[in-house]
UniProtKB/Swiss-Prot annotation:
Keywords: Activator, DNA-binding, Metal-binding, Nitrate assimilation, Nucleus, Transcription, Transcription regulation, Zinc. The keyword Ribonucleoprotein does not apply. This is Nitrogen assimilation transcription factor nirA. It comes from Emericella nidulans (strain FGSC A4 / ATCC 38163 / CBS 112.46 / NRRL 194 / M139) (Aspergillus nidulans). It is found in: Nucleus. Residues 16-27, 649-674 have a biased composition (Low complexity). Its main location: nucleus. InterPro entries: Transcr_Regulatory_Elem (IPR051615), Transcription_factor_dom_fun (IPR007219), Zn2-C6_fun-type_DNA-bd_sf (IPR036864), Zn2Cys6_DnaBD (IPR001138). Pathway-specific regulatory gene of nitrate assimilation; it activates the transcription of the genes for nitrate and nitrite reductases (niaD and niiA). Residues 1-32, 646-714, 731-761, 842-892 are annotated as: Disordered. The lineage of its organism: Eukaryota, Fungi, Dikarya, Ascomycota, Pezizomycotina.
């Protein structure tokens, strides 16, 4: 009994003995003490089944005997949970009772709630009241479950009805066309018998396929003309304004079967647009008046809208036709009517649900889904063009749009595109059309354009005006998006020589957005601008305008302006406002002259270009801009040729002032050999050439209207054009009367050019050897062989590349101007000095095709003679200062 125990032995026997011995020893040697009773033992003592004294932080057994870690965990003792179970159940019952009563009071009607309160106040036990409420709820739920089980056989119909009632959208066929019906509409309950027939009896027949093409219009039965105009439309207008499925259209067009992809309204609208790209007599209502191009087909389209009640039956082809009618009216300068047509198109697009993803709709084929998508994104482009053109908020926004991007169809993308003219197709610049790829890129630009216009050009009053920091943040965001778009552009769509016309227009649209982005910041000074010091909004606008001018010159060299969409007129106008701002800088002078000539050429096809010239003419006078001589000449020529645009034009036009009578006197003027009056008038009432701006009465107020600056030198190719033009026209005794526009312009007549001037004709017709000798003596620097658009990487390189040939070395192009004073009145000069007088040659149009790159200037006779200008035409130009007055449109 007295041997020492080993603590490593089993915990039962030895430990018990040791405890007994210890207790015995303690009883013998020390006074007796009662052990403290603890409710919870440590984990080690519970595992050993030994008694624990509950001492903290460690019990005696763990610290003295077993030397183990002592941990107390009351929650781990599951044997004591029954002690609290009764209390827990009681609390849970009370909480459930109170919760049941409170929910009943909240959900009961007013009278029932008062009854329940009285029952609670008079009851002996709240649990009984709560239990009665629970029983009532169980009875109600049991009745609902029995009702559901009873209707299991008709569950499919019930689900359909409930889904139509509770759904956010629905789709049905109404009036023979698919329409979007929203969740709040009751039209979903219309029975199937309410559908109407979409087509008239007898139209939807195959019949004779050979004559099916001529069934679409009553204007003409010339199948060749119809085919020619449609080809014009699909070659020049459709690639940019892609708003329909070409394959589906031609499928039904060739059959002569009206459908949602082809109708007489759509065909006549296409023909009206195709007329603007053709000079065939059948393309004009009046063959002798280019202002009537497409009017006869457009009148037929307007008749069809009323006669066929096209606005009642919403169809894809009607949406497309109305959108095309709107852009055609804009090209004719009738924005009011065009805006209404666009609104009808967009409303019908919403009616058809084109702004929603079509793949979720029922019973739609793949071709119909594709046609709906391409139609919507076409309307999206029309909307953004109208928004920019009129400065109004867009109708389609990203918030109300959930349509996927257009599908790139390999067959259509690989179809060969080639320039098409009145002479037929040309193999030059033939390449894959890439119509859908360009349309997708333009759609991305349109999204950016919409956000730009909404933020910077929304005139609606706001609760809190935009701060400079917010404007800077939004500007940075949109600029980043534009740069990302340009960076992600496929290589085959970059601007280059021979690029697709729609791709060039797309790049012009991109530069237009840059101008619109930075133009609102022109109102700030350098000290008040929120932009960083190194960022100049004027410089960025100038770079974008210069890029547009370069793209227009590239388009002219490649395709000419007879075939170009009218959106280019608006883009050119916007760029010219920036160039006017920068006058009299050399680059601005060049771009203004080129831009006005481009608009003059576009005016042959689009009336809006004629009006744009009048607007720029009046704006330049209002802003007191120093215009180059060539710009003044273009303004006077076009005004004499096309007349005034309206009362607003006549009130401000220099050609309708009191000093300028409407017609020239019929008295004959004797021709002289004095070169101060190189062209004279002759007797008779013969009509004059409208392009000759030589009438003193016509050009009398020019000096008072403009502050003309010396222009740059003229190229040898321009001199050659002048020589050809003048020599060809001297033999003509009669010239055409200026063609009147439908707006009844002010008529101006001129005397014919006398034909008995053999000496001057000889003077203007040097031999080819003399011409080569002259060009060798006055060699000019040539442009780089590099493509003019290969340096579009940075704006700095772009502006640097835009330094054109005539402004690089003005001393090499003075062409003997210093000798004009002494030879001015010495009679007819010899042929060796012919070209010194090239600037005084009137611009008499040649019967042959005009020079593709240059139209010679025609100075008015009352303008100062060349010896009144300094030798260097740009010597006094200060590039850092300008007399330009900011237009009101640039200021908020």
């Amino acid at each position: 009994m007295g041997e020492k125990l080993d603590p490593e032995l089993s915990s039962d026997g030895p430990h018990t003995k040791s405890s007994s011995k210890g207790q015995g020893t303690s009883t013998d040697n020390a006074p007796a003490s009662k052990r403290r009773c603890v409710s919870t033992a440590c984990i080690a003592c519970r595992r050993r089944k030994s008694k624990c004294d509950g001492n903290l932080p460690s019990c005696a057994a763990c610290s003295s005997v077993y030397h183990t870690t002592c941990v107390y965990d009351p929650n781990s003792d599951h044997r004591r949970k029954g002690v609290y179970k009764k209390d827990t159940d009681t609390l849970r019952t009370k909480n459930s009772t109170l919760l049941t009563l409170i929910q009943a009071l909240l959900n009961y009607e007013e009278e029932d709630a008062f009854d329940l309160v009285r029952q609670i106040r008079s009851c002996d036990n709240l649990e009984d009241v709560a239990q009665s409420l629970v029983n009532q709820e169980k009875k109600s739920s049991g009745w609902l479950s029995n009702a559901v089980i009873h209707e299991e056989n008709d569950i499919a119909q019930t689900d359909q009805f409930e889904s139509e009632l509770a759904g956010k959208m629905s789709n049905l066929v109404l009036d023979g066309s698919r329409k979007f019906i929203g969740g709040t509409s009751n039209l979903i309950f219309l029975p199937p018998g309410s559908e109407l027939n979409e087509f008239k009896p007898g139209l939807a027949t195959n019949g004779d396929l050979e004559g099916s093409v001529t069934r679409w219009t009553t204007v003409t039965d010339d199948q060749q003309l119809i085919s020619h105009l449609l080809t014009m439309y699909f070659s020049w207008h459709y690639p940019f304004f892609t708003t329909l499925s070409k394959e589906l259209f031609y499928r039904d067009y060739s059959r002569g079967v009206p459908s949602q992809y082809c109708s007489s309204l759509l065909v006549n609208t296409m023909l009206a647009l195709g007329c603007h790209f053709s000079s065939w007599p059948g393309a004009r209502e009046d063959p002798d008046n280019s202002a009537t191009a497409g009017d006869h087909f457009f009148k037929e389209a307007k008749r069809l809208i009323l006669d066929n009640d096209e606005l009642v039956n919403s169809k894809l082809c009607t949406v497309q036709a109305l959108a095309l009618m709107s852009v055609r009216e804009a090209g004719c300068g009738r924005e009011g009517k065009g805006w209404v047509y666009s609104g009808m198109s967009f409303r019908m697009a919403f009616d058809l649900g084109l702004n929603l993803e079509s793949s979720s709709l029922r019973d739609l084929s793949e071709e119909e889904i594709d046609a709906r998508r391409i139609t919507f994104w076409g309307c999206f482009l029309f909307d953004k063009c109208w928004s920019n053109y009129l400065g109004r908020q867009p109708q389609f926004t990203t918030a109300n749009t959930s349509v996927s991007a257009v599908d790139i169809l390999p067959n259509e993308e690989s179809t060969l595109w080639s320039p098409y003219s009145d002479m037929g197709p040309s193999r030059e610049y033939a390449q894959p059309s890439r119509t859908r790829a360009v349309a997708d890129q333009i759609s991305q630009l349109c999204k950016i354009s919409g956000d730009l216009v909404v933020f910077f050009y929304d005139l609606a009053p706001k609760e809190k005006p935009s701060s400079k920091q917010l404007e800077l943040k939004k500007l940075s965001e949109i600029h980043t998006r534009l740069e990302a778009w340009k960076k992600g552009l496929p290589k085959e769509l970059e601007p280059r020589e021979g690029q697709l016309p729609q791709a060039l227009l797309m790049h012009m649209f991109y530069q237009l957005l840059l101008i619109h982005l930075y133009r609102p910041f022109l109102k700030y000074t350098k000290s008040t601008s929120p932009l960083p010091q190194h960022v100049s909004p004027r410089k960025l606008c100038t770079q974008a305008a210069a890029a547009i001018s370069k793209l227009l010159r590239l388009y002219k060299r490649t395709y000419g302006f007879k075939q170009i969409c009218n959106i280019a007129v608006y883009i050119a106008h916007t760029a010219l406002t920036i160039h006017l701002l920068n006058l009299p800088e050399k680059n601005a002078q060049r771009d203004v002259i080129h831009g006005l000539r481009h608009l003059e050429e576009m005016g042959e096809s689009w009336l809006c270009a004629r009006r744009t010239l009048r607007i720029l003419d009046i704006s330049a006078s209002k802003w007191q801009v120093q215009l180059p001589r060539e710009a003044v000449i273009v303004f006077e020529q076009t005004h004499a040729r096309w007349g005034s645009w309206g009362p607003w034009d006549q009130a401000a036009s220099p050609s309708t002032t009191s000093d300028s009578p409407p017609s020239v006197s019929s008295q004959s003027v004797v021709a002289t050999t004095d070169l101060s009056q190189p062209v004279s008038q002759s007797a008779g009432n013969q009509p004059a050439n409208p392009s000759m701006g030589t009438s003193p009465n016509l050009t009398q107020p020019v000096a008072s209207q403009y502050s003309s600056t010396p222009s740059g030198p003229v190229s040898v190719s321009a001199m050659r054009a002048v020589q050809r033009s003048f020599s060809a026209q001297l033999a003509h005794n009669e010239a055409r009367q200026p063609e009147p526009t439908y707006l009844r312009p002010v008529s101006t007549s001129y005397g014919p050019v006398p034909s008995t001037q053999s000496a001057q004709e000889q003077w203007y017709s040097p031999t080819e050897a003399q011409f080569r000798a002259f060009t060798a003596a006055h060699s000019m620097p040539t442009t780089s062989a590099q493509s003019p658009l290969t340096t579009f990487d940075t704006p700095e390189n772009l502006v640097e590349e835009s330094q054109d040939w005539w402004s690089r070395d003005v001393n090499a192009l003075q062409l003997g101007a210093e000798d004009w004073t002494q030879n001015w009145n010495n009679g007819l000069p010899t042929t060796s000095a012919d070209w010194r007088y090239v600037d005084n040659v009137p611009n008499i149009p040649s019967t042959s095709a005009p020079d593709a790159d240059y139209k010679p200037p025609q100075p008015p006779p009352n303008m100062a003679r060349p010896n009144q200008y300094p030798t260097d035409p740009v010597a006094n130009v200060n590039s850092n200062q300008t007399n330009m007055i900011f237009p009101g449109s640039f200021q908020r």
